Amino acid sequence: MINTMIDESDKSLFRSTVDFQKPLDKDSHKKQNPRKMSSIAPFENYSFLYEANITGSEVITHFKDGLSPKVLKKMKQGNIGSTPSIDLHGYKIEQACQSVSDFIHFHSDKRFIQIIHGKGYHSDNGLSIMKSQVVHYLKQHPNVLAFCSCPQDMGGTGAVFVHLKTDV
């Protein structure tokens, strides 16, 4: 049986240790700012593409006018730092679009994200429906400034880096 009684010498030692301590002022510590959510509603007005038109090995590049070529070069080289990513393997088209919409909305304070769509190796005709839909969706999204296939060691043609218009 464990003795739960505290003897006087232990009490005295404890008191002598904490006696000179002052309680923390509740307002003096730094408060963390909660994650700023986008004031813009998630993009929901997109169309679906039900026929694949892009092969799994095709390199993708798309950018809006006015984007600096340096930014696109950095994206193609993977020199954009750590990026949040979403993996769409196993998703149906509708689920994937909704998930990408939510993902972009949640990460609207980031400049870059990564979307892993796969290469469509299990497709009947060698065309990737998921990759085609992701490209179709990103071209419609108003907050997407550019996207391109990732470097080979970061997903290659089975993933894209996306440059977002930040609202922060």
Task: Please identify what each model-predicted range represents.
Residues 1-112, 116-168:
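Long, charged, low-complexity intrinsically disordered regions
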